[in-house]
Amino acid sequence: MSSNEEELRRRLRLIHLLHQTNPYPDGPGTANQRRRRRRRWRQRWQQILALADRIYSFPDPPVDTPLDLAIQQLQRLAIEELPNPPASAPEPLKDAAESP
């Protein structure tokens, strides 16, 4: 097997692993709970598809490029977590709300 075929197989295994980490939601719950689970699942699925596309289309590092640079570029590929909303309003907004 050539190195190109091995690299393609490695990328496909990685993409397959990504797909396995996000199973379709099932289980009990109210209609709203099931709907929210499906919505979150679709959002994660879209992120996985985008990540898989980037992995598949990521160019092979040139021979003269250091391996560390290629690793750093691959480490930037990640599924983003949605941030939690802030517990309180920032100071400038509090001041504006208090003085009409």
Swiss-Prot record:
GO terms for molecular function: DNA-binding transcription factor activity; RNA binding. The keyword RNA-binding applies. A motif (Nuclear localization signal and RNA-binding (RRE)) lies at residues 30-46. The keyword RNA-binding applies. It is found in: Host nucleus, Host nucleolus; Host cytoplasm. Residues 18-39, 80-100 are annotated as: Disordered. Residues 14-22 are annotated as: Homomultimerization. A motif (Nuclear export signal) lies at residues 67-79. One of its GO terms (cellular component) is host cell nucleolus. One of its GO terms (biological process) is mRNA transport. Keywords: Host cytoplasm, Host nucleus, mRNA transport, RNA-binding, Transport. It comes from the Viruses. The RNA-binding motif binds to the RRE, a stem-and-loop structure present in incompletely spliced viral pre-mRNAs. This region also contains the NLS which mediates nuclear localization. These overlapping functions prevent Rev bound to RRE from undesirable return to the nucleus. When Rev binds the RRE, the NLS becomes masked while the NES remains accessible. Escorts unspliced or incompletely spliced viral pre-mRNAs (late transcripts) out of the nucleus of infected cells. These pre-mRNAs carry a recognition sequence called Rev responsive element (RRE) located in the env gene, that is not present in fully spliced viral mRNAs (early transcripts). This function is essential since most viral proteins are translated from unspliced or partially spliced pre-mRNAs which cannot exit the nucleus by the pathway used by fully processed cellular mRNAs. Homomultimer; when bound to the RRE. Multimeric assembly is essential for activity. This is Protein Rev. It comes from Simian immunodeficiency virus (isolate PBj14/BCL-3). The gene is rev.
